[in-house]
């Protein structure tokens, strides 16, 4: 495996891509909900070993300029789990080495989680959610191609697009409310 990426050298097993919307300020409860589903133990329980994991923010950055902020393959734990190949194969793998790699992966992903979820109270001037979605699906730089037999795109967003060409907010607001660029009245 590539030491910095934890990925197998000659195969692509699967790819889970997390696209997280930071265009509206998030409340602490929303941050907790997001982190509880896309980081830490949740990754180990829901994503098989050696599947690639990538994270990208939806924010004020131009879609073509946005970078994938973290991309690594999930290291195996060495313990038995629901996933085939998770347990150390004593015939050809060293258990201590597997544990060391998993600990390195866990440390890097924990450090990244803190960086990624910082500044969750900022507000963007636009929300080009669908452009980001198309970018991930179409652009080779995302490495979200059919070369992976299993692909999953996870979008953490209210899916409320707003930009110059198209805005959901203009369809759900009165003229007086249009002064608030990314707020929509309650649907209750």
Show the residue positions of the predicted features.
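Von Willebrand factor
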Residues: 1-9, 12-148, 152-155, 161
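Short basic/glycine-enriched coil/helix segment immediately N-terminal to the Walker B
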Residues: 10-12, 147-148
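N-terminal post-signal-peptidase region of extra-cytosolic proteins
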Residues: 33-42, 135-138, 180-187
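Mid-length scaffold segments of soluble, non-membrane domains
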Residues: 146-155, 165
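VWA/integrin I-like adhesion module and closely mimicked acidic/polar interface patches used
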Residues: 160-188
């Amino acid at each position: 495996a590539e030491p910095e990426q934890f990925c197998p050298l000659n195969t692509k097993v699967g790819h889970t891509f997390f696209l997280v919307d930071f265009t509206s300020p998030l409340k602490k409860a929303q941050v907790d909900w997001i982190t509880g589903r896309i980081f830490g133990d949740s990754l180990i329980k829901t994503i098989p070993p050696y599947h690639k994991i990538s994270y990208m923010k939806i924010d004020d950055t131009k879609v073509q300029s946005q970078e994938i902020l973290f991309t690594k393959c999930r290291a195996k734990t060495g313990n038995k789990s629901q996933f085939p190949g998770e347990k150390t194969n004593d015939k050809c793998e060293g258990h201590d080495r597997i544990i060391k790699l998993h600990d390195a992966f866990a440390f890097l992903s924990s450090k990244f989680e803190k960086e990624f979820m910082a500044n969750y109270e900022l507000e963007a001037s636009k929300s080009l959610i669908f452009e980001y979605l198309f970018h991930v699906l179409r652009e080779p730089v995302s490495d979200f191609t059919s070369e992976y037999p299993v692909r999953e795109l996870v979008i953490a967003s209210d899916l409320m697009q707003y930009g110059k060409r198209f805005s959901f907010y203009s369809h759900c607001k009165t003229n007086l409310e249009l002064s608030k660029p990314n707020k929509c009245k309650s649907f209750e």
